[in-house]
From Swiss-Prot:
The keyword Electron transport does not apply. It is a multi-pass membrane protein. Component of the signal peptidase complex paralog A (SPC-A) composed of a catalytic subunit SEC11A and three accessory subunits SPCS1, SPCS2 and SPCS3. Component of the signal peptidase complex paralog C (SPC-C) composed of a catalytic subunit SEC11C and three accessory subunits SPCS1, SPCS2 and SPCS3. Within the complex, interacts with SEC11A or SEC11C and SPCS1. The complex induces a local thinning of the ER membrane which is used to measure the length of the signal peptide (SP) h-region of protein substrates. The gene is Spcs2. Component of the signal peptidase complex (SPC) which catalyzes the cleavage of N-terminal signal sequences from nascent proteins as they are translocated into the lumen of the endoplasmic reticulum. Enhances the enzymatic activity of SPC and facilitates the interactions between different components of the translocation site. The modification N-acetylalanine is found at A2. It comes from Mus musculus. It comes from the Eukaryota. Residues 2-86, 133-226 are cytoplasmic. This is Signal peptidase complex subunit 2. Keywords: Acetylation, Endoplasmic reticulum, Membrane, Transmembrane, Transmembrane helix.
Amino acid sequence: MAASASQGGRSGGGGGSSGAGGGPSCGTSSSRSGLLDKWKIDDKPVKIDKWDGSAVKNSLDDSAKKVLLEKYKYVENFGLIDGRLTICTISCFFAIVALIWDYMHPFPESKPVLALCVISYFVMMGILTIYTSYKEKSIFLVAHRKDPTGMDPDDIWQLSSSLKRFDDKYTLKLTFISGRTKQQREAEFTKSIAKFFDHSGTLVMDAYEPEISRLHDSLATERKIK
């Protein structure tokens, strides 16, 4: 990835203001600001094939995820991924049972069990499709912000994105869900990927990170005011 946010000038400034906006109180704002000032992005640059839409989207997603987890110190929640893995595991279980049962009881003796396993497998695949379409959607990160006092439930931050095929417009959406009120707010931007990659296909974090920080700060500031 690109050079550190503090060395990038404007990235460092954005990090400082992010800490002030997202702090729970005046006392913790200064310490959080200092933490963000020291934060830096991994020095290893991300270089991809600019014509590979999946690689472009994945690199932008991973970098946005890195900002929330490393800059703002949020804790990732793997609930969505665990749900998908559970469904896939159950599906594989039915496939394995069918294989073993057919080996132990050759067809046609195994026919009833095979039919049950095949039907169950396709039912689980249907459940997986519904889960990814309506539950996961395009969310690639769910992160929790712990309440400093430990009295209120965790605030939840979600990142989702989209990049249509043969389109250069990348959309990143950040969703904030208050742990105390359960109110949900969203902020997003849609920009050309050309703004974030140089001619060689290297992701320019000095251009990308401030956009993510602005999304976060707009929601964090609104949360603090309310």
